[in-house]
Design a protein with these regions (language model features):
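N-terminal secretory signal peptides that target proteins for export/translocation
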Residues: 1-16
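Bacterial N-terminal signal peptides
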Residues: 17-31
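Histidine-rich, glycine-flanked metal-binding segment
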Residues: 36-39, 44, 53, 57-101, ...
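C-terminal cap of metal-dependent C-N hydrolases
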Residues: 51-54, 404, 416-454
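His/Asp/Glu-enriched, well-ordered alpha-helical/loop segment
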Residues: 114, 127-131, 135, 139, ...
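Polyanionic/metal-chelating signatures
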Residues: 157-305
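Glycine-enriched alpha-helix->loop->beta-strand junction motifs that scaffold or abut catalytic
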Residues: 291-297, 314-321, 361-363
């Protein structure tokens, strides 16, 4: 798998009052989420001593120290080279391994109501219809739609936070899951129960699904594709008219304000990220065509059949947010040719998706997806490893790679001075079956869990 610096950030630069501190020759990183809620309160200064440090972006430190101050990593390195500050609270970590907090770049965490069932109507064709000159249907001109912010639907629960902490996760992208234009996601740092201090970036990405809801509009796959295309065409035209009027309004009729098209403009004109949910290989091909047509800053989520579309993805490489649901989609031959083949696919073929992508040299992150608790997600990662994905590749796909995809690699995704102090202390190797998470730091806030067994 390629995990080099060639991977560009596909989300807009991070903007907020949090300034990422620097150490040595590290330059000052960008700040987080403009106009977002205030940063989380930070605890005291900590010095984590005598742990093995796995930075991800550098070689391990066998017996090291990590100093955390004001929610940031102030220093880290071998114990004989890092001075422990006199005001630091000592966290003794003999026998533990320190990892950067894991990142899930797609989840439905804290969404109280489950998403309505989808029809999953199959279609083999990937032809995209031409709709020039037709207007987007009125039935979908108002929320739920592209302007809907999933943040408004979230209700954090302590048990859910703890579940993800105990699996090593500290950061999640929470996305809506209803409709075609599902709305906009929010990026959270899991630093407690109130939602406000968790927010790293609201309106992080626009999410689109090709599968219509039962009884929804449009009612067919071709109608859905046409609706998506026409919406982007209309948004581009709307933006052009607004820009023309703003530049020279004299003699021009004022363009009518349209909240739905207004919400789409940043994704069409400013290249804010658009995440396509791809439930099968045909969805991947459709998404690639639409992304190319409108020059979208696209990511493909789910992608559990990406291995079957590897050639297309090599020609048009985009970030892949690979889900850990190993059930074959309804459109697959593995789901339609008998129970024995379906079970074999679920146990052997689909768990190898990530391993095949790594062999093909495609960049991907592993994501928790919908409806799973932290423990279930981590078990699925281990299943992917047993199916051939290397442990190092899996760790990269859960840390620095999603951070790169989210435009956060200067703040998260590895253990380095100046980055946000998201640190997980583990008895054993995190991705092993017998690993136990002992302590978790998020934004420098310490969460203590049950004492690990000796």
């Amino acid at each position: 798998m390629k995990n080099s610096a060639r991977v560009s950030s596909v989300l807009s630069p991070v903007r907020s009052p949090i300034v990422i501190a620097v150490a040595a020759l590290v330059t000052v990183a960008a700040a987080l989420a403009a106009a977002g809620p205030p940063a989380a309160d930070v605890g005291p200064t900590y010095a984590i001593r005598n742990c093995r440090i796995v930075p991800v972006t550098g070689p391990p430190v066998e017996k090291g120290v990590i100093v955390i101050r004001d929610g940031l990593i102030e220093a880290l390195g071998p114990a004989d080279k890092v001075k422990v500050p006199g005001d630091a609270e000592i966290v003794e970590a003999e026998g533990l391994i320190a990892y950067p907090g894991l990142i899930s770049a797609l989840s439905n965490l804290f969404i109280e109501q489950p998403a309505p069932a989808r029809t999953g109507a199959p279609a083999a064709e990937t032809e995209i219809p031409s709709l020039a000159g037709q207007a987007a249907p009125a039935e979908d001109r108002y929320p739920p739609g592209p302007g809907q912010l999933v943040l408004d639907q979230l209700k954090p629960k302590k048990a859910t936070v703890e579940s993800f902490h105990k699996a090593g996760f500290t950061t999640v992208l929470v996305a809506p899951a209803r409709g075609i234009f599902e709305g906009q996601s929010v990026l959270l740092n899991l630093n407690g129960e109130p939602i406000g201090p968790m927010v790293l970036r609201n309106g992080a990405a626009l999410h689109i699904n090709f599968t219509t809801e039962r009884g929804g509009y449009p009612s067919s796959l071709m109608g859905t594709i046409a609706h998506i295309r026409q919406s982007f065409i209309d948004a581009d035209y709307y933006a052009a008219r607004q820009a023309q009027y703003a530049k020279s309004p004299a003699g021009l009729k004022r363009p009518e304000y349209d909240p739905r098209l207004e919400a789409l403009v940043p994704f069409v004109r400013d290249r804010k990220p658009v995440v396509f949910q791809c439930n099968n290989q045909e969805d991947i091909k459709r998404a690639l065509k639409i992304a190319a047509e409108f020059k979208l800053n696209a990511l493909l989520a789910g992608a559990n059949e990406a291995w079957r579309a590897a050639d297309a993805l090599k020609k048009s490489p985009v970030p892949l947010l690979v889900g850990l649901d190993f059930r074959p989609p309804a459109t697959s031959k593995y789901a339609t040719q008998g129970e024995d083949l379906r079970k074999k696919a679920e146990a052997e073929i689909y768990p190898a998706n990530a391993a095949e992508l790594a062999k093909a040299g495609l960049d991907f992150a592993l994501v928790s997806g919908a409806g799973a608790d932290g423990g279930t997600v981590l078990r699925a990662v281990r299943t992917a490893i047993k199916a051939g994905l290397g442990k190092d590749a899996a760790l990269i796909a859960l840390t620095i790679q999603p951070a790169r995809f989210l435009g956060l690699d200067r703040a998260l995704g590895s253990l380095e001075p100046g980055k946000i102090a998201n640190v997980v202390l583990v008895k054993g190797e995190l991705l092993d079956d017998n690993a136990q998470v002992a302590k978790v730091f998020v934004d420098g806030v310490l969460f203590k869990y049950a004492e690990v067994s000796k």
